[in-house]
C-alpha cells in the first residue's frame, strides 16, 4: 500500500515549492497558480492553508459555510427567541391567574370570619401566627442534626406558647374580667391568674431555659445556641408585632379591617401597576419592584383609605369596641368619629363648584394618615423580608398559599402596619376609659379591707354632695 505524501510545512516538497519564484504580474501569477494546481492538486495554495487535509477515502472535507446556511441559523435563532418570549408571557399570565384565584379565596375566607365577629378574627390571627412561626422555625432546622437531638424542636414551641400566654394575657385582661364578673368563683380564679400572670409566665420561661441547658450536647453547642437565638428573634420581630393586631381588634373591627385592607390594596395595586407599566427598578433587594408600581400603588392606597373609611364607618357592628369575650352583635354609640360632619368649601372655590361643601366622617381624615403610612412606609416591611430571603437564598418562606408563597410572605407588611395602627389609635383616637368591672377588680385585688371601707365611705360622701348640688 502506497504511503501518503508528506505535506507538512517542513517537508522537502513544500520547501521547494516555497523557494520557487513566480511572475509578479497578476495575469502571469494566475496562470502559474493554475498550472501549479493542475500539476500538484494536493499542495496548499498559501502558507495559511497548511491545515488542509489531502483527499483520501477517510479524509474529512471541510467546506466554507454558505450564506444560505447562515440565514437559516439566524431564522432558527429568531424563532427560538420569539418562542421564549411567548413562553415567558404565558408563564407570566399563568402566575397572575393563580395569584388572583388564591387572593379571591383568601378574601372570601377573611370576609366570612369578619362577619362571625371579634373572637373568630382573634382565632384567625393566632392560626396565622402559628403558621408563620412554623415556616420560620423550619428555615434554621437541619434534619441530620435534629436526629441527634430528639424532641429539641419542642423547645421552640414551648417558648412560643409562653410568649403567647404573656402577651394575650395582658391584651385581653379587661375583656376577661368583664366576662366572668357574674360568677363569683370563676371571678376569683381569673382575678388570681391575672394578678400572678407575670410570675407564671416568667417561671414557664425559666423552665424552658433549664430544659435547653439540660439538652446541650458536645459538638452541638453552636447549632443549639443558634436555635435558641433564632427562636427569640422570631418571638420579638414576628410574634410581638403581629400581636398588636389583636389589640386593634378589640378596639373595634374597623381598626383591624381598615389597616389590613390598605396593605392588601397597596400590594394588589403595586402588582398590577408594575405588571403593566413597570420599567424602572425601585430597589435591588427586590428586582421586581418598580417605581411605577410604587407610585401608582401609593396614589391608589391613599384614595382607597378615604373611601374605605366612609364605607366601613356606616356599619355599627364594625365600629363598636368589644368590652368582653362574648360573640353577639354589638350596638353602641359610635361616637363623634363616625358621625357625619359638614365641611364648607372656601369662598374662592364655591363659584367654580356646584357644591358648597362636603359631608364626611371625621374618621376619614385619620384614615388618610393610615393610608399615607401604608403606601410609603409599610412596603419597607416587604423589602426587609426580601433581604431576609436573599440572606437565606430562598424564594419564599413557604408554599402554603399558591401564587403568594407562605403566610410570612403575606404578613410582612401587615406586621409593620399593625404596630403603627395601634400606636396611632392609642395616641390620637382612643380616650382610655375603664369599666365598672375593671375598677372593682383593681379595688378588690389592690386594697385591703380597711382601705375598701374608707373608699366606700368616701364615695358615699361624694355622691351625697352631688345630690345636694354642693360638689
Swiss-Prot record:
<feature type="region of interest" description="Disordered">
    <location>
        <begin position="1"/>
        <end position="72"/>
    </location>
</feature>
<feature type="transmembrane region" description="Helical; Name=4">
    <location>
        <begin position="196"/>
        <end position="216"/>
    </location>
</feature>
<feature type="transmembrane region" description="Helical; Name=7">
    <location>
        <begin position="293"/>
        <end position="313"/>
    </location>
</feature>
<keyword id="KW-0472">Membrane</keyword>
<keyword id="KW-0443">Lipid metabolism</keyword>
<feature type="compositionally biased region" description="Polar residues">
    <location>
        <begin position="21"/>
        <end position="35"/>
    </location>
</feature>
<keyword id="KW-1208">Phospholipid metabolism</keyword>
<dbReference type="GO" id="GO:0016024">
    <property type="term" value="P:CDP-diacylglycerol biosynthetic process"/>
</dbReference>
<keyword id="KW-0808">Transferase</keyword>
<keyword id="KW-0548">Nucleotidyltransferase</keyword>
<feature type="transmembrane region" description="Helical; Name=3">
    <location>
        <begin position="149"/>
        <end position="169"/>
    </location>
</feature>
<dbReference type="InterPro" id="IPR016720">
    <property type="entry name" value="PC_Trfase_euk"/>
</dbReference>
<comment type="pathway">
    <text>Phospholipid metabolism; CDP-diacylglycerol biosynthesis; CDP-diacylglycerol from sn-glycerol 3-phosphate: step 3/3.</text>
</comment>
<comment type="similarity">
    <text>Belongs to the CDS family.</text>
</comment>
<feature type="transmembrane region" description="Helical; Name=5">
    <location>
        <begin position="228"/>
        <end position="250"/>
    </location>
</feature>
<comment type="function">
    <text>May be involved in the synthesis of minor phospholipids and in modulation of IP3-mediated signal transduction.</text>
</comment>
<feature type="transmembrane region" description="Helical; Name=2">
    <location>
        <begin position="120"/>
        <end position="139"/>
    </location>
</feature>
<dbReference type="InterPro" id="IPR000374">
    <property type="entry name" value="PC_trans"/>
</dbReference>
<protein>
    <recommendedName>
        <fullName>Phosphatidate cytidylyltransferase 3</fullName>
        <ecNumber>2.7.7.41</ecNumber>
    </recommendedName>
</protein>
<keyword id="KW-0444">Lipid biosynthesis</keyword>
<keyword id="KW-0594">Phospholipid biosynthesis</keyword>
<keyword id="KW-0812">Transmembrane</keyword>
<keyword id="KW-0460">Magnesium</keyword>
<keyword id="KW-1133">Transmembrane helix</keyword>
<feature type="transmembrane region" description="Helical; Name=6">
    <location>
        <begin position="255"/>
        <end position="277"/>
    </location>
</feature>
<feature type="transmembrane region" description="Helical; Name=1">
    <location>
        <begin position="97"/>
        <end position="116"/>
    </location>
</feature>
<dbReference type="GO" id="GO:0016020">
    <property type="term" value="C:membrane"/>
</dbReference>
<dbReference type="Pfam" id="PF01148">
    <property type="entry name" value="CTP_transf_1"/>
</dbReference>
<dbReference type="GO" id="GO:0004605">
    <property type="term" value="F:phosphatidate cytidylyltransferase activity"/>
</dbReference>
<feature type="transmembrane region" description="Helical; Name=8">
    <location>
        <begin position="368"/>
        <end position="388"/>
    </location>
</feature>
Amino acid at each position: 500500500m502506497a504511503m501518503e505524501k508528506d505535506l507538512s510545512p517542513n517537508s522537502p516538497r513544500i520547501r521547494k515549492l516555497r523557494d520557487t519564484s513566480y511572475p509578479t504580474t497578476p495575469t502571469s501569477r494566475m496562470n502559474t497558480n493554475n498550472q501549479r494546481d493542475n500539476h500538484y492538486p494536493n499542495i496548499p495554495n498559501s502558507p495559511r492553508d497548511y491545515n488542509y487535509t489531502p483527499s483520501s477515502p477517510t479524509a474529512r472535507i471541510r467546506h466554507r459555510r454558505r450564506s444560505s446556511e447562515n440565514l437559516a441559523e439566524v431564522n432558527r435563532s429568531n424563532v427560538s427567541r420569539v418562542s421564549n418570549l411567548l413562553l415567558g408571557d404565558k408563564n407570566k399570565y399563568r402566575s397572575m391567574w393563580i395569584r388572583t384565584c388564591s387572593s379571591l379565596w383568601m378574601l372570601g375566607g377573611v370576609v366570612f370570619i369578619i362577619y362571625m365577629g371579634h373572637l373568630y378574627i382573634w382565632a384567625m390571627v393566632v392560626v396565622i401566627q402559628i403558621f408563620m412561626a412554623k415556616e420560620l422555625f423550619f428555615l434554621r432546622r437541619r434534619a441530620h442534626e435534629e436526629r441527634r437531638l430528639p424532641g429539641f424542636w419542642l423547645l421552640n414551641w414551648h417558648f412560643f406558647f409562653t410568649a403567647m400566654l404573656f402577651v394575650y394575657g395582658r391584651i385581653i385582661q379587661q375583656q376577661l374580667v368583664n366576662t366572668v364578673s357574674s360568677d363569683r368563683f370563676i371571678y376569683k380564679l381569673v382575678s388570681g391568674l391575672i394578678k400572678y400572670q407575670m410570675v407564671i409566665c416568667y417561671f414557664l420561661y425559666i423552665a424552658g431555659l433549664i430544659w435547653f441547658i439540660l439538652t446541650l450536647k458536645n459538638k452541638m453547642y453552636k447549632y443549639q445556641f443558634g436555635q435558641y437565638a433564632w427562636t427569640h428573634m422570631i418571638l420579638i420581630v414576628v410574634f410581638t408585632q403581629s400581636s398588636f393586631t389583636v389589640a386593634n381588634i378589640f378596639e373595634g373591627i374597623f381598626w383591624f379591617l381598615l389597616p389590613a385592607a390598605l396593605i392588601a390594596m397597596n400590594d394588589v395595586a403595586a402588582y398590577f401597576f408594575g405588571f403593566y407599566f413597570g420599567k424602572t427598578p425601585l430597589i435591588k433587594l427586590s428586582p421586581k419592584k418598580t417605581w411605577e408600581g410604587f407610585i401608582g400603588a401609593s396614589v391608589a392606597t391613599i384614595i382607597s383609605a378615604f373611601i374605605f373609611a366612609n364605607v366601613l364607618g356606616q356599619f355599627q357592628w364594625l365600629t363598636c369596641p368589644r368590652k368582653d369575650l362574648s360573640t353577639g352583635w354589638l350596638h353602641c354609640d359610635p361616637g363623634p368619629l363616625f358621625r357625619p360632619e359638614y365641611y364648607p368649601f372656601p369662598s374662592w372655590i364655591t363659584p367654580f363648584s356646584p357644591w358648597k361643601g362636603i359631608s364626611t366622617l371625621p374618621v376619614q381624615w385619620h384614615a388618610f394618615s393610615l393610608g399615607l403610612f401604608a403606601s410609603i412606609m409599610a412596603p419597607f416591611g416587604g423589602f426587609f423580608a426580601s433581604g431576609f430571603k436573599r440572606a437565606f437564598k430562598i424564594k419564599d418562606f413557604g408554599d402554603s398559599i399558591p401564587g403568594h408563597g407562605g403566610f410570612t410572605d403575606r404578613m410582612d407588611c401587615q406586621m409593620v402596619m399593625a404596630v403603627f395602627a395601634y400606636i396611632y389609635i392609642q395616641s390620637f383616637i382612643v380616650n382610655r376609659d375603664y369599666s365598672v368591672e375593671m375598677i372593682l377588680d383593681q379595688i378588690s385585688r389592690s386594697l385591703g379591707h380597711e382601705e375598701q371601707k374608707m373608699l366606700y365611705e368616701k364615695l358615699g360622701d361624694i355622691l351625697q354632695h352631688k345630690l345636694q348640688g354642693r360638689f
